[in-house]
């Protein structure tokens, strides 16, 4: 059975990109844990039905207690993972950093031709 490793990040000066990367990793783990808890809840309902029919014999009661403790443990682990996600201090530096030359593509929606710098236009005029 795989063990769950909880990594707490103590580093205070994470950049926005590092915070996003860590948050994505933690959200993947949280989603997996929530899927496991859904399976545990489904099994818990099956055991509840069996216990209702058989009036709680020893093994079914043990399974019921084990599944309930499993669901509670998973919920506590999800809360710990959610709390340990680092929050970025300054996201504006990361968001304002130009990633490419086409960063402001959505701003120019008109049919006008692109504006060139004056030096480039001067060179074109000289060639004619």
Curated annotation (Swiss-Prot):
It is a multi-pass membrane protein. GO terms for cellular component: endoplasmic reticulum; membrane. It is found in: Membrane. It comes from the Eukaryota. Coiled coil: none annotated. The keyword Transmembrane helix applies. Disulfide bonds: none annotated. The keyword rRNA-binding does not apply. The chain crosses the membrane at residues 33-53, 61-81. Its main location: membrane. Residues 99-128 are annotated as: Disordered. Residues 99-120 have a biased composition (Polar residues). Keywords: Membrane, Transmembrane, Transmembrane helix. This is Putative uncharacterized membrane protein C622.07. It comes from Schizosaccharomyces pombe (strain 972 / ATCC 24843) (Fission yeast).
């Amino acid at each position: 059975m795989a063990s769950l490793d909880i990594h707490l990040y103590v580093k205070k000066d994470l950049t926005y990109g590092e915070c996003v990367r860590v948050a994505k990793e933690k959200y993947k783990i949280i989603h997996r844990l929530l899927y496991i808890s859904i399976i545990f809840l489904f099994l818990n309902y099956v055991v509840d039905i069996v216990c209702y029919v058989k009036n709680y014999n020893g093994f079914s009661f043990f399974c019921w207690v084990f599944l309930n403790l499993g669901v509670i443990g998973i919920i506590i682990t999800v809360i710990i993972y959610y709390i340990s996600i680092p929050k970025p201090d300054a996201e504006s530096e990361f968001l304002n950093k130009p990633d490419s030359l086409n960063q402001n593509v959505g701003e120019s929606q008109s049919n006008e031709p692109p504006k060139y710098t004056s030096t480039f236009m001067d060179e074109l005029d000289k060639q004619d």
